[in-house]
Amino acid sequence: MLLSDKYPFLTEYFTRALSTNVRALPQSILFYGNDADAQFTFATEIARLLNCTSDKSDNCECLNCRWIRENSHPAVLTISRIDNKPDDDDSKTVISIKQSQMIKEALVSASEFHRVFIFCDRDENGNIAGLNPLNFQAETANSLLKIIEEPQPGVTFIFLTRYVEDVLPTIISRSQCFFVPSFKEISYSYNCISDVF
């Protein structure tokens, strides 16, 4: 099932924002809800559409789209407690200040791609989970504020969490927040509606 079938409102919003003008897209996005996998899918799809060099279709096979589907695009980075750690970073339970510094250093140089940083939690088995005060601590979040507040063109930050309150208020205030229901919640809602009518 396509994202547009599962999440018509969100898909339409982001498709319209991206087709109108890339500048219409918020440069800091926060997805929240119970389904971290759906949030991650949305985040990678936004990254794919921002970097597609062809027709932006669901099955596009341009190099950028293939890289993003393979999670190997050089400008689309998942930032978690286990992903994209600098060599000298031995923290295993948090997104670290060293990762924040790595992002800042990466943004100093120009890129031919639209850079997307997806912040989430991921365990050793690859399971995606949302950010929370334990894995995305205030010190790290605060160290990112300047680059989120004054982002360069061609850079998007996406934060995934279960509850909005689990992310520092200063990140929330600089982000556009979207609730991503789990597909089970959507199915349940449709069943309730069909039961009434």
Where are these regions (language model features)?
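P-loop/Walker A NTP-binding region and its immediately flanking N-terminal helices
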Residues: 1-133, 156-158, 169, 190-195
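Proline-centric
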Residues: 108, 151-152, 178-181
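A short beta-strand-to-loop transition that corresponds to the Sensor-1 phosphate-sensing loop
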Residues: 120-122, 159-164, 181-184
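Conserved Walker B catalytic segment
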Residues: 122-156, 163
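A short helix-turn-beta junction within AAA+ P-loop NTPase domains corresponding to the substrate/partner-engaging
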Residues: 169-185
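Long amphipathic alpha-helical scaffold regions
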Residues: 174, 178, 189-196
